[in-house]
Amino acid sequence: MIWRSEHIWIELIVGSRKISNFCWAFLLFLGSLGFVLVGTSSYLGKNLISLVSSQQIHFFPQGLVMSFYGIAGLFISSYLWCTISWNVGSGYDRFDRKEGIVCIFRWGFPGKNRRIFLRFRMKDIQSIRIEVKEGIYARRVLYMEIKGQGAIPLTRSDDNLTLREIEQKAAELAYFLRVPIEVF
């Protein structure tokens, strides 16, 4: 979501609370839970899942391997659920022409550096840079080039913006900030 006025541009950034992350975390949890149940039922010799008979799967090596993959999947699923609940990567970009300040805020993982807050003067912005890599894994990222700081990404590489959308966004932001656009 973008909110703009004559002097201020605020863009809210969606972090890890995307529908795709919810779907992946849910599917991974169900799949790995199924693997753990099949491995456990082969160990106990009881049918915990009615789809597979425990006599068809021997505990060593199939049941053991399925249990291992199930436990690994549960760990990965719990990691995804934690990033969703902490909303890692969300935040905002705030460009204030009146005060001449740019603020970039993102939520990180819990700990000492949970809040990532960057603040720059607008006159330190050299350019808005578009990086485009075409091919099977196309990647289009928008950067803000800062004197002495390097390039700071403004969009995620997994946003999957079309070339037209990223060009439009770069042009609007460069016009608002009154800086040139570079394309790589």
Swiss-Prot record:
The question of whether Nucleus is a record keyword is answered with: no
What Gene Ontology biological process does one annotation of this record name? photosynthesis
Q: Where in the cell?
A: Plastid, Chloroplast thylakoid membrane
Q: What is its main location?
A: plastid
The record's keywords, sorted A to Z, are:
Chloroplast, Membrane, Photosynthesis, Plastid, Thylakoid, Transmembrane, Transmembrane helix
Q: Transmembrane segments in this chain: where?
A: 19-39, 64-84
InterPro entries, per the entry: PSI_Ycf4_assembly (IPR003359)
The UniProt entry lists membrane topology as: Multi-pass membrane protein
Describe the family membership recorded for this protein in Swiss-Prot or TrEMBL: Belongs to the Ycf4 family.
- What role is this protein assigned? Seems to be required for the assembly of the photosystem I complex.
Q: What is this protein called?
A: Photosystem I assembly protein Ycf4
Q: Which organism is it from?
A: Oenothera elata subsp. hookeri (Hooker's evening primrose)
